Design a protein with these regions (language model features):
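Alpha-helical transmembrane bundle of multi-pass membrane proteins
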Residues: 2-332, 353-654
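Short intracellular "coupling" helices and adjacent cytoplasmic loop segments at the cytosolic face
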Residues: 334-344, 350, 357
């Protein structure tokens, strides 16, 4: 029996060698155009090099950047990056270094404390964003009357309010102020600020605006003053929203990048929840309640302001500036071993050297913006990020986040009960964001979106139809709240975390700041449009019409995502260059001609048609072979029991 297992293992090993030889040959034989990846292959820039070529290139890199004293470490790191499944065969690796690489697969959440501290600070920045949104939610019930712009159709004495329609528009514009300023100014300031001050400096500047502007809103005496302070808040929100997801994405390892970067939405949801708590806490303070509701949003900005400089700067930003020594120091703080830091330093350098082929010369801000639409690889990322950001507004989440108190009052709730119902919405939104930590890197960004959008459509439709129940019925308010909560439960693990995570990772480093600015500006511009129009829409179409309208937009968003949003899970930021080099026409053709028919065969006609054929592969391996590579890698780092199990599976496969 033992002899049979040994012979079987030898056969598997020989076949793995043959497969590996084909893998290397495919990598070296095919030229690659980063703007037109017609072969749909994702390539490791080191895989086609011989060991001697890698060593020679690393030595030249070390000499050029002052790393002569750590050349052996860089060589080991480059050889590990060259062939990740075979890292055990690299000469000179210590047991500690091997354990560090193993744990990337077996214990991917074992990361340095400073990485988690950085993500916590970024999460606080997200909470600021959420709290800023809900301050106006509660204040909507009282600030119009306090500032002389009453929105009711009739005054308490029964006389008609002739300015009601005008004041509804003013209320919408004031609520939209931060999003108008973010979309047209704040987001676009992030590129020059990032260029001169780095990621941390930009976050600091934005935190100053986010700390002071809510205080200005709280002391405003006229609606004009309130509008100006809301515009100033938007400057900080735009810079922060464009920078923090990038900062998280650039610091996180690929295996958990999605889960860490999605903390932006999870903690935005937490900020929304805290904002609803603050609205409830101050509701009985009389005439100043709306001032406290606006002003409380400055509280989470203070720890962000003080803590950001305790985080390491983005190593990719340092590399972009040619500051490799500082990049390595940052990576040492963000990785478990110096080997992993050296490996990532050289691998990022190698990928960015290829990425530099996008632009052969240094470009200014305006040129980079134009290139979002003219360079094919960047244009595809621009389209995908635009789609997911637009979808966040099409789904209708912000009609609840901005106006839930108003919506529940129209459903027959008292002011206190409306604030309590809004608090429940904030709690559900936050609680159901947690599953995305585990699912976003397992099922993927695209899969989560395609599953949750149909669910959001029917829950919004149901919520709207529940307004047709007579208001005297006890079921009226309860069912409206139930379906709004179900809507939030489906939104939170899908369209909630994905847009900012996705947009932060899809652009090449050369265009990452301006690309993220574009994505966030898209999101906030349409949030402004929604905020301005919804009060009037609610008045003209009734809650039933407004909710049904947004239910239909969910279906539109589903179709756009299906056609234009590729999957990005578990790829390094640099490997995404190859995914977005696939022509849009080919991607759409694959979705319509392959994926859609497969889905109908599998789930409608219930036929056993196997796995859906993949569009891209990794260096010559088709999708099933990608699983095969991961199986080999896991077998090289797993305990003996798992290794024997994997060898048996591979033997059966061959």
């Amino acid at each position: 029996m033992a002899s049979h297992e040994i012979n079987q293992s030898k056969v598997v090993a020989e076949r793995l060698d043959v497969a590996d030889e084909k893998y290397r040959k495919a990598s070296s034989d095919e030229a690659f155009n980063i703007n037109d990846n017609v072969t749909a292959k994702i390539q490791n820039p080191l895989a086609h090099l011989t060991k001697e070529e890698v060593i020679r290139d690393v030595e030249a890199f070390a000499l050029e950047n002052g790393f002569q004293d750590m050349t052996p470490l860089l060589v080991k790191g480059a050889l590990v990056a060259k062939d990740p499944p075979a890292f055990e065969s690299v000469e000179g690796l210590t047991d500690v270094e091997k354990d560090g690489v193993r744990n990337e697969v077996l214990h991917k959440w074992r990361q340095p404390k400073l990485l988690y501290f950085t993500i916590i600070l970024c999460s606080i920045g997200a909470a600021v964003q959420g709290w800023d949104q809900t301050g106006s939610n509660g204040a909507n019930l009282s600030f119009p009357d306090a500032l002389g712009i009453p929105i009711e159709n009739k005054f308490p004495d029964g006389t008609v309010n002739p300015a009601s329609e005008r004041n509804l528009w003013l209320q919408g514009v004031i609520n939209a102020g931060p999003y108008i300023a973010s979309a047209f100014i704040g987001c676009w300031c992030s590129d020059p600020l990032n260029n001169y001050f780095g990621r941390r400096g930009t976050i600091f500047v934005s935190a100053v605006f986010c700390a002071l502007s809510p205080i200005g809103s709280a002391v405003s005496q006229t609606w004009d003053q309130l509008f100006v302070t809301r515009l100033l808040l938007g400057l900080g929100m735009g810079c922060k929203g464009s920078t923090i997801p990038i900062f998280s994405a650039e610091n996180a390892p690929a295996s958990i990048r999605g889960a860490l970067v999605m903390s932006w939405q999870m903690w935005t949801a937490f900020g929304i929840f805290l904002g609803t708590c603050a609205n409830l806490a101050v509701k009985d303070t009389g005439a100043i309640s709306w001032r406290l509701q606006f002003g409380s949003a400055s509280l989470p900005a203070l720890p962000l302001l003080l803590g950001v400089y305790f985080c390491p700067e983005s190593p990719r930003w340092y590399i972009k500036k040619g500051r490799y020594t500082e990049a390595y120091q940052s990576l040492k703080k963000l990785r478990n071993t110096e080997l992993q830091a050296a490996r990532d330093l050289y691998y990022i350098h190698a990928q960015l050297s290829i990425e530099a082929s996008l632009t052969n010369m240094k470009t200014n801000y305006v040129t980079r913006f134009i290139q979002l639409f003219t360079i094919p690889r960047v244009r595809r990322a621009t389209l995908a990020s635009f789609t997911v950001m637009l979808a966040q507004q099409l789904c209708g989440i912000n009609i609840i986040a901005f106006y839930s108190s108003t919506v529940f009052v129209q459903a027959g709730a008292s002011v206190t009960n409306a604030l309590l119902a809004s608090w429940g919405f904030g709690l559900v939104n936050f609680a159901f964001a947690w599953p995305a930590i585990w699912t976003i890197d397992t099922f993927g960004r695209r899969s989560l979106l395609l599953f949750t959008f149909p669910q959001m459509a029917w829950t919004l439709l149901a919520a709207g139809l529940c307004y047709l129940i007579p208001s005297s019925s006890s079921a009226h308010l309860g069912l409206v709240a139930l379906f709004v909560y179900l809507f939030a439960a489906f939104y939170s693990p899908g369209e909630g975390p994905v847009p900012f995570t996705y947009s932060a990772e899809v652009f090449p480093l050369s265009h990452r700041e301006v690309g993220m600015s574009w994505a966030v500006a898209t999101c906030l511009f349409w949030a402004a449009v929604l905020s301005i129009t919804f009060p009037r829409m609610l008045d003209a179409m009734s809650p039933t019409g407004a909710f049904c309208f947004y239910a239909g937009l969910n279906i539109v968003a589903f179709c756009l995502i299906f056609l234009f949003v590729p999957e990005t899970k578990q790829r390094t930021l640099e490997e995404l260059d190859y995914i977005f080099a696939i022509p849009t026409r080919r991607f759409v053709s694959h979705q319509c001609g392959t994926v859609l028919p497969w889905w109908f065969q599998r789930y409608v006609f219930r036929r056993n048609v196997g796995e859906c054929p993949a569009l891209w592969s990794f260096d010559g391996h088709m999708d099933n072979d990608k699983e095969f590579i991961e199986t080999i890698r896991r077998s090289s780092v797993a305990p003996d029991e798992r290794r024997r199990s994997v060898v048996g599976k591979l033997a059966n496969k061959f």
